[in-house]
Design a protein with these regions (language model features):
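Binuclear metal-dependent hydrolase catalytic cores
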Residues: 1-131
Length: 131
């Protein structure tokens, strides 16, 4: 098993826009962190944990490979704001979303166009698994 940390920053990322603290103004690359996300890989599957608004930037440098599912820890924007960027990965097939029911309800409200019966072309195929 391999765990790849895609981001370990706060909900606003680091550096935070407008912040003048020593970390946010540091030139050290270790002080430049995208929002929290990870990919867990085994021989059989690749599971994304959280898909925040930095997702596109987090995966641009990685090999373009199938994502077998996404585990969403909670419904805050910094953990779900990048779900629409899963569109290219749907070329491999549906990318199921795994989440608690309260998170699934929030996703249906936030992104209803993804979870209706008749989606328009190009909408990511990200069914809510088990719901």
């Amino acid at each position: 098993m391999k765990v790849r940390i895609l981001g370990s920053g706060t909900s606003t990322g680091v550096p935070q826009i407008g912040c003048t603290c020593p970390v946010c103004t540091s030139a050290d690359p270790k002080d430049n962190r995208l929002r929290a996300s990870a990919i867990v890989e085994t021989e059989d599957a690749r599971i994304l944990i959280d898909c925040g608004p930095d997702f596109r930037a987090q995966v641009l440098h990685l090999p373009f490979e199938k994502i077998d599912g996404v585990l969403i820890t909670h419904e805050h924007y910094d953990h779900v704001g990048g779900l629409d960027d899963l569109r290219p990965f749907c070329r491999f097939g549906a990318v199921p979303i795994y989440a608690e029911e309260y998170v699934a309800r929030a996703l249906r409200l936030r992104m209803p166009y993804c979870f209706v019966d008749h989606r328009y072309p190009g909408v990511p195929d990200i069914p809510l698994a088990g719901n």
